[in-house]
Amino acid sequence: SVGFKAGVKEYKLTYYTPEYETKETDILAAFRVTPQPGVPPEEAGAAVAAESSTGTWTTVWTDGLTSLDRYKGRCYHIEPVPGEEDQYIAYVAYPLDLFEEGSVTNMFTSIVGNVFGFKALRALRLEDLRIPVAYTKXFQGPXHGIQVERDKLNKYGRPLLGCTIKPKLGLSAKNYGRAVYECLRGGLDFTKDDENVNSQPFMRWRDRFLFCAEAFYKAQAETGEIKGHYLNATAGTCEEMIKRAVFARELGVPIXMHDYLTGGFTANTSLAHYCRDNGLLLHIHRAMHAVIDRQKNHGMHFRVLAKALRLSGGDHIHAGTVVGKLEGERDTTLGFVDLLRDDFIEKDRSRGIYFTQDWVSLPGVLPVRSGGIHVWHMPALTEIFGDDSVLQFGGGTLGHPWGNAPGAVANRVALEACVKARNEGRDLAAEGNEIIREASKWSPELAAACEVWKEIRFNFKAVDTLDPS
């Protein structure tokens, strides 16, 4: 008889392979699967493997024209999620030949494409990916990385300080530049375009770039420090985005910016390549991430988006504060912060890391802390995240009762005091408030900031928490 038999067969007969031993070259994925009632977990896991690789809903004769064993995804392990009814972690291995080299876009189109609308599943979430060394080497990665950035800025041994200019929309270019100048003059390393500042009627991009460049050159001359402003090059087309990046380079600024999720991975990778070739650092904002990553049972965890960004390219990325107004549990956040910064990260389920990840020669990314943070948070931020991070105080700078420059002074004094105390062996977690109070005795700017924000708390539990072990 003919080898082809038409009809529908269960996915698990082909795609559930518990005996499979993963290869070093496989891309491995951990999915949180919530099957529909009556669908066994093995069938659900196999369906995910099939629909995100070579499978379709029925047997087709063209399967015989290729080697399914070589190209199919395999669900090789399933485990129940502790404390959750009808939720499972399904581990899927994908052969490397399924993916185009150097394309995050293609990787995601396969792994998190149509399968997320699959009717046999009530919900599906991609918790983690293991990117093999062979695939990692196909990417340029961050435009420059942590060490090159420090060398360009000549700033070592402490976190970098930033500030998002507010109000985020409505300022004219000249007033915007004035706010930038005041912040940089006061002691910040960077100021930032808000993610939704592109080129609107009240402030066209070219005017903003010019006034911001004037501001940071003036602040550099006055302080003797290298300064920067993240000029947001995000635009409606890739061509327009690159045009803005070219103008930023012509102005001699050190850093540009992109909204990588709304702009898209193809645009982001193009911009990262341009920045590497032309000496620009690249700051990345994650606008839209919570649409994808906030719900615990459906979507994609931010650690996956963070890994994807390191492949696509970016020198900074916003990554949760733990202590501010935006979502972020401590152990989970530190897990993906290490995935951004370190060369090699061991599997550690207590921090949500499902796979050991080796980044080989890919440069690291500086995690950015922003959103509802102020001077009283400085000891915790310094202690939790260490030197290799960017601390960004928007309202926590511009909301100072005396203005932007004193707000910047307050943050710089608080940071220097915390770094000095840490280097002297003091415990920032236990003595943080005392360290800030001591510093405020000789800094009136810090004293005023301490008074304004002494009662501010954002005491809400994180939605996306770790599973019980």
Swiss-Prot record:
Q: Where does Mg(2+) bind?
A: 192, 194-195
Top-rank taxon? Eukaryota
Q: What Enzyme Commission number does this protein have? A: 4.1.1.39
- Record-level GO BP terms: photorespiration; reductive pentose-phosphate cycle
Query: Which Gene3D superfamilies does its entry note?
Result: Ribulose bisphosphate carboxylase, large subunit, C-terminal domain, RuBisCO large subunit, N-terminal domain
The record's note on quaternary structure and interaction partners says: Heterohexadecamer of 8 large chains and 8 small chains; disulfide-linked. The disulfide link is formed within the large subunit homodimers.
What protein does this entry describe?
Answer: Ribulose bisphosphate carboxylase large chain
Its source organism is Fleroya rubrostipulata
